[in-house]
Amino acid sequence: VSDWANTAAYCPARFADGTLRSAQARHAVRLMASRLAIDIAQPTLSRCDGIDSLDVDTDSLAAMAAAEDQVGFAMEVFAARSFGHATLDISDRHKTTSQRLISLSGAEDNRAKTYDVTQLLANPNTIVDSATGLYAPTDAVLEMNCARSEIAAVAASSTSSNASTKSQTTSDDHSDDSREQ
């Protein structure tokens, strides 16, 4: 698990692959532990506290902020209707991450803040994941779409030759966002 996480962290060209494989490995470990009745620690939610800058261009940070904002809004709607595993805490964490990312970007805040949830409300339990074509819990698809958007933004940032306003992370804190690690 940590090898894939390290690949994502230290090899920009393999960020997407490392991130997804790390998540898959963590999921496999959880499934195996559950089947073997092994108690493993629950993942901790991470935050953006203490992060002063990121080595990602302005446009990518703004795109990541928009993805976090959109899933935060959807989770808020789902929590209000008691759908899936959505909670107001999850919604708040996404929205806080969104705000932090847009602040770090220095870009004009063009987030919509409210989004069309008609399709989500029509399919509150399961929905087709457009990336895989498979039915999955709607809240899980929302999280995966957010993660895919962020991975694409970072991948675009790492391959962009004219990336604007890049700076190094100045925090010693390893927190990166509001989703489970």
Please identify what each model-predicted range represents.
Residues 1-181:
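All-alpha RGS (Regulator of G-protein Signaling) helical domain and cognate RGS-like helical scaffolds
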